[in-house]
Amino acid sequence: MNELVVILGWLGVYAPVALGALGSAIGVAIAGQAAAGAMLETESGYGRFVGVSAIPSSNVIYGIVIMFSLQRAVTPENGAPLFAIGSLVGIALLYVGIWQGRACASAIAASKNKPEIFGLALAPAAIVEGFAVFAFVFALVLAGSIPA
C-alpha cells in the first residue's frame, strides 16, 4: 500500500505539467485553427490573430511552477496530498486551456469581421485565465503546508 501512495505522489508532482501542457496544446490548436481561417478572410493584422492563439499556452507555465513547488522526496506521509493537489490543479489547467482556446477562437472570429472590438473580444479569454490563476495560487498555498 505504501508503494502505491508513493507512486501516486510522484504522479501528483508531474500531473500539473502534463495536464497543463495537454490543455495548452488543445487550446492553442483550437485558437490556431480560428486564426488560420481568419487570415484567409482578412487582408492584414495577422499578428494579432497568431498572438491571441498563443494565450492558452500560459497554463503549462502554471503547471511547471506548481510542479516545482510540489517537488520533494515523496513518502507515504505526503504522497496523498501531493497526488490530490497535483492532479486537481492539473485537471483545472486542462479544462481552462481547452475553454480558453474556445474563447480565443471566438474572439478571433468576432474581431476579423469587426476589428474595433478586438480588445473587448479578449475579455472572456481573460476571465477564463482568472480561474487558472485561482487554481495556481491555491495550489501554491496548499503546497507550502505539505510535509517534506
Model-derived segments and spans:
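Hydrophobic, small-residue-rich transmembrane alpha-helices and their short perimembrane loops
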Residues: 1-148
